[in-house]
Regions:
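An N-terminus-focused feature that recognizes amino-terminal "leader" regions
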Residues: 1-9, 15-47, 52-58
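N-terminal beta-strand motif that seeds the catalytic metal site of vicinal oxygen chelate
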Residues: 1-19, 74-83, 129-158, 202-205
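Amphipathic alpha-helical segments
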Residues: 16-29, 89-96, 153-169
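Vicinal oxygen chelate
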Residues: 90-143, 179-189, 213-251
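A structural feature that tracks compact, well-ordered secondary-structure segments
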Residues: 54-58, 80-84, 92, 98, ...
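Conserved catalytic-core motifs of GNAT/GCN5-like acyltransferases
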Residues: 29-36, 105, 169-173
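Intrinsically disordered, low-complexity segments enriched in Gly and acidic/Ser/Thr residues
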Residues: 172-206, 210-216
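A mid-sequence, solvent-exposed acidic-amphipathic segment
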Residues: 140-190
């Protein structure tokens, strides 16, 4: 059974720079990190509210993460759904004709993991994971709220994610320009291609900060630009961040 969105994967050029941003500047607790030579990456998982952020950097030029970085630059790489039995989930998907990158689960930083092929998910990269343990997450100054994505057909993509992962449909624009999906409080917000994004993929993260002014001060002290808008702060992609961030105030 798929229970929740476990984490969002963000690709950066250098993991140390990524940790400097996510751990040191945003003050997210580091849960664990590891070199994964069989996957050609270094990775770190950080707590972020009820979810987690996985920061990935390539260690070999032929890894999937390296290819992503070469073609798209730093950015949001994947969304991971937690299952209580990823082996069963993979068998179910294969049995119903869903294309998988991993025909069998393998060990990853989040536990036993398997990636669904993007062609089965509206060209979005999705991971399944069964964590090896389920310790309570520490309190964090920021919480992951939503992942923004661009797709070719918003309605079809939303239906596919509902069918595969049991996501709940929320607000949807009548003209098909926006659909909001959720699972245990975390949201995916889908819009059509455009606005500088010619290919389907995840484009930005929305976070919530308990103290928005303190975050703005920390960003300023480290020379990281941010802009205020009606929602809160917008942090453009920069070294280590890996993705545009939209940060709103609230608990």
């Amino acid at each position: 059974m798929i229970a929740r969105i476990h984490h969002v994967g963000v690709v950066v050029q250098d993991l140390d720079a990524g940790l400097e941003f996510w751990r040191d500047t945003l003050e997210l607790p580091l849960l664990r990190s590891a070199d994964l030579p069989d996957q050609g990456v270094r990775a770190a998982l950080l707590a972020c509210g009820t979810g987690e952020v996985e920061v990935l950097a390539p260690t070999t030029p032929d890894s999937g993460v390296a290819r992503f970085l070469a073609s798209r630059g730093e950015g949001v790489h994947h969304v991971c759904f937690e299952s209580d039995d990823v082996v069963r989930e993979v068998r179910r998907f294969i049995g119903t004709g869903v294309d998988m990158i991993d025909g069998k689960p393998r060990q990853g930083l989040a536990g036993k993991v398997a990636f669904v092929h993007p062609r089965a998910c509206a060209k979005l990269l999705v991971e399944l994971a069964t964590p090896s343990g389920r310790a309570p997450l520490p309190e964090t100054p920021l919480a992951l709220v939503a992942v923004h994505g661009k797709v070719e057909d918003v309605g079809a993509a939303a239906q596919r994610l509902q069918d595969l992962f049991g996501m709940n449909r929320g607000f949807a624009a009548e003209d098909g320009s926006f659909v909001q999906l959720s699972l245990t409080g975390l949201m995916l917000q889908l819009t059509p291609l455009g606005g500088g994004f010619p290919k389907p993929g995840f484009t930005a993260l929305r976070l919530r900060a308990g103290d928005l002014s303190a975050l703005a001060r920390r960003l300023g002290e480290r020379g990281i630009p941010c802009q205020e808008n009606a929602v809160g702060l917008v942090v453009p992609p920069g070294p280590g961040a890996g993705a545009p961030l939209i940060v709103e105030a609230g608990r």
